[in-house]
Amino acid sequence: DQSGQRRWFPINANRSIERSFIMAKDRLITPGYCFILAANFLLYFGFWLLIPVLPFYLSEFFQTGNSTIGIVLSCYTVAALCIRPFSGYLLDTFARKPLYLFAYFIFMMMFGGYLIAGSLTLFIIFRIIHGVSFGMVTVGGNTVVIDIMPSSRRGEGLGYYGLTNNTAMSIGPMFGLFLHDAGVSFATLFCYAFGSCILGFLCASLVKTPYKPPVKREPISLDRFILLKGMPAGLSLL
């Protein structure tokens, strides 16, 4: 019996080591993953914080009507939609994390741009740049989080990542309206959003990503920017 125990012990030990190695390899909660979750939450929190108060800001400071307010605010969404088809191509062609951080930095700085926008025209320009950077940083964040998580837990990891946006969406507008109703100035609100993105940018810069060789450049074609097979899924989501 004792000899049998000695004979099977190495096998059990090897199985235990192998099981531990697999668990470590498939580990989802890592410092990098936590940093990217925080970066995404803080980015969306700054975004949603201003969504309900921007109409009041445009109305009070620029004396704009409701239709003009709608057009100005929609410039952001239109700009984000226009850049998204090219975002994937850029992220595959160039280094992903630097491009992600660059887009995050531009997105962050536009909150400061709102503070110095002395005319409606300048505000619209900042709004368009803000939308372009938002389209880039959101796609870049999705790419980075996929790169740093184990493929076996990709669905779970993306679910938690998307939850950060939902959480920010649930508390950001409420927080913004609460501050506005409490008499907080618009400049202070912009600073809060700016500060949120500063913290998010710091978290994003701490994420360590594996090296991904750039995709070989191919001739420019429509399928590089629009995946026709994905059109039905996109229409159903719309």
Please annotate each region the language model reported.
Residues 77-85, 169-170:
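Residue-level signature of mid-helix packing/kink "hotspots" within the transmembrane helices
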Residues 121-129:
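Paired small-residue
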Residues 29-70:
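Helix-loop boundary and gating motifs at the non-cytosolic
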Residues 23-30, 209-237:
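Juxtamembrane intracellular "pre-TM" segments in multi-pass secondary transporters
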Residues 128-164:
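Cytoplasmic helix-loop-helix junction between adjacent transmembrane helices
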Residues 189-204:
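Symmetry-related core transmembrane helices of the 12-TM Major Facilitator Superfamily/SLC fold
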Residues 98-112:
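Structural signature of the two symmetry-related core transmembrane helices
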